[in-house]
């Protein structure tokens, strides 16, 4: 990815102090999405990265991973699979719990998400990699469905949190922007 694109993306992402709670600097990508030419450049750059890798599906983590993942799946001509919070998918699901700062949560994937095909090649995508909990749980769901995650892709990775390192121990990890 070229440095000009990275700089344009960084400048387009709004930072909101103390959201959703005090001490957090929230990275809001809705401002990036308001610029169609820049969003297209982002998706085109990701398409170029994955086009030759024979990807079968893009797996997007709720909610902003849906935006990036759907656009990328369309650009690549492959299927899109959502990973959602527990209780949000209508058919039979597999569930995976993960730890939060205070407690735990669960995410789910449809048990037929890859149409019953074993060994499909997928890219996992989300907007932000922080602690890595949701991404690691998503990898477990992908593995449970006997798919191969080729890479976990994030628009941003927070260097001061352990997510990048934890994920790199399990799967090739790409963060377009390290913040």
From Swiss-Prot:
Transferase found in the keyword field: yes
One Pfam family of this chain: Pribosyltran
GO BP annotations listed: adenine salvage; AMP salvage; purine ribonucleoside salvage
Assembly: Homodimer.
Keywords tagged on the record: Cytoplasm, Glycosyltransferase, Purine salvage, Transferase
UniProt cross-references to InterPro entries, sorted A to Z: Ade_phspho_trans, PRibTrfase_dom, PRTase-like, UPRTase/APRTase
Function summary: Catalyzes a salvage reaction resulting in the formation of AMP, that is energically less costly than de novo synthesis.
UniProt protein name: Adenine phosphoribosyltransferase
Assigned EC number: 2.4.2.7
Family: Belongs to the purine/pyrimidine phosphoribosyltransferase family.
Pathway annotation from the record: Purine metabolism; AMP biosynthesis via salvage pathway; AMP from adenine: step 1/1
Location of this chain's protein in the cell: Cytoplasm
Gene name tied to this protein: apt
GO cellular component, one term: cytoplasm
Gene Ontology MF terms: adenine binding; adenine phosphoribosyltransferase activity; AMP binding
Catalytic activity: AMP + diphosphate = 5-phospho-alpha-D-ribose 1-diphosphate + adenine
